[in-house]
Amino acid sequence: MPVQAAQWTEFLSCPICYNEFDENVHKPISLGCSHTVCKTCLNKLHRKACPFDQTAINTDIDVLPVNFALLQLVGAQVPDHQSIKLSNLGENKHYEVAKKCVEDLALYLKPLSGGKGVASLNQSALSRPMQRKLVTLVNCQLVEEEGRVRAMRAARSLGERTVTELILQHQNPQQLSANLWAAVRARGCQFLGPAMQEEALKLVLLALEDGSALSRKVLVLFVVQRLEPRFPQASKTSIGHVVQLLYRASCFKVTKRDEDSSLMQLKEEFRSYEALRREHDAQIVHIAMEAGLRISPEQWSSLLYGDLAHKSHMQSIIDKLQSPESFAKSVQELTIVLQRTGDPANLNRLRPHLELLANIDPNPDAVSPTWEQLENAMVAVKTVVHGLVDFIQNYSRKGHETPQPQPNSKYKTSMCRDLRQQGGCPRGTNCTFAHSQEELEKYRLRNKKMSATVRTFPLLNKVGVNSTVTTTAGNVISVIGSTETTGKIVASTNGISNTESSVSQLIPRGTDSAVRTLETVKKVGKVGTNAQNAGPSAESVSENKIGSPPKTPVSNAAATSAGPSNFGTELNSLPPKSSPFLTRVPVYPQHSESIQYFQDPRTQIPFEVPQYPQTGYYPPPPTVPAGVTPCVPRFVRSSNVPESSLPPASMPYADHYSTFSPRDRMNSSPYQPPPPQQYGPVPPVPSGMYAPVYDSRRIWRPAMYQRDDIIRSNSLPPMDVMHSSVYQTSLRERYNSLDGYYSVACQPPNDPRTTVPLPREPCGHLKTSCEEQLRRKPDQWTQYHTQKTPVSSTLPVATQSPTPPSPLFSVDFRSDFSESVSGAKFEEDHLSHYSPWSCGTIGSCINAIDSEPKDVIANSNAVLMDLDSGDVKRRVHLFEAQRRTKEEDPIIPFSDGPIISKWGAISRSSRTGYHTTDPVQATASQGSATKPISVSDYVPYVNAVDSRWSSYGNDATSSAHYIERDRFIVTDLSGHRKHSSTGDLLSIELQQAKSNSLLLQREANALAMQQKWNSLDEGRHLTLNLLSKEIELRNGENDYTEDTVDTKPDRDIELELSALDTDEPDGQSEQIEEILDIQLGISSQNDQLLNGTAVENGHPAQQHQKDPGKPKRQSLGEDHVILEEQKPILPVTSCFSQPRPMSISSASCLPITTSVSVGNLILKTHVMSEDKNDFLKPIANGKMVNS
């Protein structure tokens, strides 16, 4: 059995006895086959043959000279004259010169021969391939003929490698890989990367290793199908190029077929992965050589395998591919390179020596060289190697460049094992392990510094940014982008907000802390720059005695939580005064998986603001104290979808109403019907939760768009949400995939992202919450309430009443509708407000309001109170959206912002703007021009009353969930714009009145709700008939129908969606009649300030006469709605009640059909006091004027 040969790096020890060579006992003696053993082991051989390859030893063992080239590396002294005698003196002379050259070259191996465990200070200047070839040369026995042949071949190989090294020194490594893959692609082949290429080759082997013959198409499809789960980017084209690479390498045996594709069978010698991979690699190396590229084995290993462990493998491939002509070609290439660079190191002097080495025959059976040829070859190789070392040390731009470690890399952070165990490292300077303790500590320290300097959040610790920090009770400071203290609020138990502390309790919302923080700072900075529009002082909001929900939850890094109403009070969200931040900062880095916290406005805030330490991380979620109901996130966003993934810009909206019959649709819609919903239903969400923005099964998430003048907050206004019992099961599950952030109710589920269906109650059990809902409507639109009037930002809203939250409605304001906290204007074509109380088929949600284009205000939910008596009068909901003229519309259809159409702001994702149970098609094509739409345009789509209006909860398509909540009052406000400047007076009066009437309001609300339900079904028919009679009498007396022909016929009807919540005592009924008299009488005077005429596109409508035989009541009660002419039949329900025995129930009454016109609903507001000159009127721009 031949002995296993040692590794080439262990050339300083005997491969048989493993003893290190020395000059006494274990003298190194090289054999003709280039194996070197110690003299002791050589004398013990039984036969004169090499123990490794069984080559015969022709010369006497005692005559073979000692290899002093190796002895000098272990510290032995080389004698000047060696006692060796050849046939003649000339041979001895040539031998001495050649031996001296080899011994000189061996000195370059000195770093590999340091003492055991001791690192050598002088690192080798030669690369690892050069060192390996030099070891081969040093081990040659020049005395024997076989040894001289091997020495000549080793000299040639060393010279060829020298040329390659010199070319590599002049080559740009950045362009190397690009040039290589360009050459590979030019031949119809492709390399897919180390991991993917390896997997593809293994799959090809799996398909063909049994000798089966497949067509190229079938083979490619098989590989692609198996690759797709791990590599989704795999395609038939790319895999076909990989197969073509193997085809070029002659790995297949091809069988041609007539009029059919050829069959490919893997050759037997390539039916193992190692053989197939070697041939594959050899083909790529061959392509590189054809392209004239010089690539080192290290680079090959890195390119093809992604590591440095395959250098020897690649070197052997390179060596095998070398042809006798390749050396000469390399010399020519080097000459051209030197001409281009100017040759500062005078490398042209090496050209004769290189040409001499190139002329050596590399064949193993070549003729034995003469002694003179041996001497010349050794001198030539010594010269060129010296020239290479000199160039690397003195002229190379890459010479001894220290590799730059990446953060957290393992580069030189542990000691070299070869150095410890063998006493020397063959890798030299290229070793990725440390060779000394100083080097080890140096790189470990550098690694720590690089890790510490990685910035996770670029805006921390700058002016105006307050980071989050944990306090003792789990409270977290909000990220506020203001340069000054914006205001300090303390929530007290009596509902008063003081300015003492600015710490707010935060709750987690989704993930991506750094992304969310940067986004929040950006939005708050934008809000801060617009804060001057809100009033003289941004801190004026904190003067409110009534806690109001934040105007814009996410913009102030504070999202209201739908928590228990008895847990603390609501807090004011203060708009920052100013902000120094630019809003053009990129908002969305690619990934981060932390948690961002947002304010919970219902929690006590007793702590001062500490500063945030400079770390890049956020504290854990705040702990919930014992005995307190925990608040779940109000706005939940899934984190398993990449933020930057966008749907196609032209992606059609999903149709959530595909199950309805065609008669329920607006069949004359100018838009194409959307395709069917492509995602299945999502499991039901918890009670009060909005349908999610996207399904977590989708592969993209709707992105937030950035504009110059408006920051889209992608959040909903803080509002109370609808109980799950209102929805029927099928409808609820159908709408769970609608777009928009969804709210989570007070009940904390196990996981904020998991949907927990709650028990559904029958509709008849909702009666205790109807009055509460009507009382809390103002709270839900506070975010869109204050825009231009300085005092309007401080308008009060009704505080939370002790009754439970109302489950009566849910409004989905899409993320397209966003406003800043104070003063940010709409800068896009303004969308219509979708009202939850609308009738599904009429679409009072489709209103488009024509008003002053730039005077944009959205006031809502003003609590109107009597200045004298303190009794609560009414709440008038003024929903208004402004529409710019078409020439002022800056919207580009395919810009990065949302598309604005007559249906509102249309985002780039599949969304439905509002929750309704009727099939209203509210989609728009991108880029469609914004066109005003009047309600009368849609009158033909209102069908006659059918079975859908017959009962409250039997039909799944019934809109009674919404239409029974309130009446809609529509007023022609064409002449009101000129009086909009007087709205400030009323706002001031409202602010002064709120403190006197707060307690009375709560008491009246509580009393009204107790008495309301006693008259569940009484008098609803009588009230409606009485209402019609009273209206006709008022209209006949005042003749105000003749005063309203001043509007243009083509003018849009401006719709004011208003709901009157009437909770007044019995003594107010006579005053209400007086109020109507005042309003109807003055309407024809003050410049038509309140035109009571029913108008359809600017023309007065004919009045509809009711049957005079119906019973009549003595007062209007609280139904202040004028129901007038209607061409089609429109269902209207009586929704207002009064705490009297004959009042009307709002939650349990059946729908009542009457003849009204959708365009002719007139809003009659009531007087604030007994004075006839002091009453409120809705104005076109959303302000309220005190006449």
From Swiss-Prot:
Q: Which reaction does it catalyse?
A: S-ubiquitinyl-[E2 ubiquitin-conjugating enzyme]-L-cysteine + [acceptor protein]-L-lysine = [E2 ubiquitin-conjugating enzyme]-L-cysteine + N(6)-ubiquitinyl-[acceptor protein]-L-lysine
Name the principal localization, coarsely classed. cytoplasm
Keywords, alphabetical: Cytoplasm, Metal-binding, Phosphoprotein, Repressor, RNA-binding, Transferase, Ubl conjugation pathway, Zinc, Zinc-finger
User: What segment(s) does the record annotate as region HEPN-N?
Assistant: 91-170
Region annotation (Disordered) ranges: 527-571, 640-677
Q: In which pathway does it act?
A: Protein modification; protein ubiquitination
Subcellular compartments: Cytoplasm, P-body
* GO molecular function list: DNA binding; double-stranded RNA binding; mRNA binding; RNA stem-loop binding; ubiquitin protein ligase activity; zinc ion binding
Q: Output the PTM entry.
A: Proteolytically cleaved by MALT1 in activated CD4(+) T cells; cleavage at Arg-509 is critical for promoting RC3H1 degradation in response to T-cell receptor (TCR) stimulation, and hence is necessary for prolonging the stability of a set of mRNAs controlling Th17 cell differentiation.
Q: Which tissues does it occur in? A: Highest levels in lymph node and thymus and slightly lesser amounts in brain, lung, and spleen (at protein level). Very weak expression in heart, muscle, and kidney (at protein level). Expressed in CD4(+) helper T-cells (at protein level).
Q: Enumerate the residues marked as the site Cleavage.
A: 509
SMART domains the UniProt entry points to? RING (SM00184), ZnF_C3H1 (SM00356)
* Polar residues bias (residue ranges): 529-545, 553-571
Q: Which cysteines are joined by disulfide bonds?
A: none
Principal EC category: transferase
| Activity control, per UniProt | Binding to dsRNA, but not CDE RNA, crosstalks with the E3 ubiquitin ligase activity and may inhibit ubiquitination.
**Result of knocking out the encoding gene:** Mutant animals are born at Mendelian ratio, but very few reach adulthood, a large proportion die within the first days after birth. Lethality can be rescued by changing the genetic background from C57BL/6 to outbred NMRI, on which mutant animals appear healthy and fertile, although smaller. Immune cell homeostasis is normal. However, Mice lacking both Rc3h1 and Rc3h2 genes in CD4(+) T-cells develop lymphadenopathy and splenomegaly with increased spleen weight and cellularity, already at young age.
List zinc finger spans: C3H1-type.
410-438
A GO CC annotation recorded here is: intracellular membrane-bounded organelle
List this protein's GO terms for biological process: B cell homeostasis; limb development; lung alveolus development; lymph node development; multicellular organism growth; negative regulation of T-helper 17 cell differentiation; positive regulation of non-canonical NF-kappaB signal transduction; post-embryonic development
Identify the InterPro entries for this entry: ROQ_II, Roquin_1_2-like_ROQ, Roquin_domain, Znf_CCCH, Znf_CCCH_sf, Znf_RING, Znf_RING/FYVE/PHD, Znf_RING_CS
Q: Where is this region: ROQ?
A: 171-325
How does it associate, per the subunit comment?
Interacts with EDC4. Interacts with CCR4-NOT deadenylase complex. Interacts with MAP3K5; the interaction is probably stimulus-dependent.
The name this protein goes by in its record: Roquin-2
